Curated annotation (Swiss-Prot):
This is Protein-L-isoaspartate O-methyltransferase. GO terms for biological process: methylation; protein modification process; protein repair. The active site is at residue 59. It is an enzyme of class 2 (transferase). Its EC number is 2.1.1.77. Pfam families: PCMT. HAMAP family: PIMT.
Length: 208
């Protein structure tokens, strides 16, 4: 039954323009039902966002795939994730690169994500309880930064932690949000707009 649901989801993602086979293989390998509440397990392979508690959500699989594809990852990419959340996006990244650094503002979510990743034998992840606006400077610079909550503007600390040639993908805005791709080239930042999106806000400075 689960296999059929995964096949249906992968077919939907392909129809929506996701082409990276390595990414699709990672999505197939990560059991999304392990990252949602028991009450939502039957919806785990629907292409929809789901609540995970503390006012946060697990992003819809299409958005996870789209944002990950935009990062243009190689196995050697040094990756920073802002907003560990359930750990689902983290797990996808962990299948694609040698190591992932992930920052989560809410301690309970960080602990749960860490436990889930360990249960799935994904040991190439470092998580930290901290303010996503500040990134993780001591582990930088990064080739790729993915932000899974929306700041009203691009955080300066994250721009500083993006390496030359690096790519950052994030939603930006308050009431209306736009998915943006930021590339660092010759010390300058080139910003491209992708599409309108809806994410929870990236809360600044306030740990929970």
């Amino acid at each position: 039954m689960v296999n059929k649901r995964i096949e249906t989801l992968l077919a939907q993602l392909r129809q929506q323009g996701i082409e990276d086979e390595r990414l699709l293989t990672a999505i197939e390998a990560v059991p999304r039902e392990r990252f949602v509440d028991e009450a939502f397990e039957h919806k785990a392979y629907e292409n929809t966002a789901l609540p995970i508690g503390s006012g946060q959500t697990i992003s819809q699989p299409y958005m996870v795939a789209k944002m990950t594809e935009l990062l243009n990852l190689t196995p050697e990419s040094r990756v920073l994730e802002i907003g560990t959340g359930s750990g689902y996006q983290t797990a996808i990244l962990a299948h694609l690169v040698q190591h992932v650094c992930s920052v989560e503002r809410i301690k309970g979510l960080q602990w749960q994500a860490k436990r889930r990743l360990k249960q799935l034998d994904l040991h190439n992840v470092s998580t930290r309880h901290g303010d996503g606006w500040q990134g993780w400077a001591s582990r930088g610079p990064f080739d790729a930064i993915i932000v899974t909550a929306a700041p009203p503007e691009i955080p300066q600390a994250l721009l500083e932690q993006l390496d030359e040639g690096g790519v950052m993908v994030l939603p930006v805005g308050e009431q209306s949000q736009i998915l943006q791709v930021v590339q660092r080239h010759a010390g300058e930042f080139i910003i491209k707009t992708v599409e309108a999106v809806r994410f929870v806000p990236l809360v600044k400075g306030e740990l929970a």
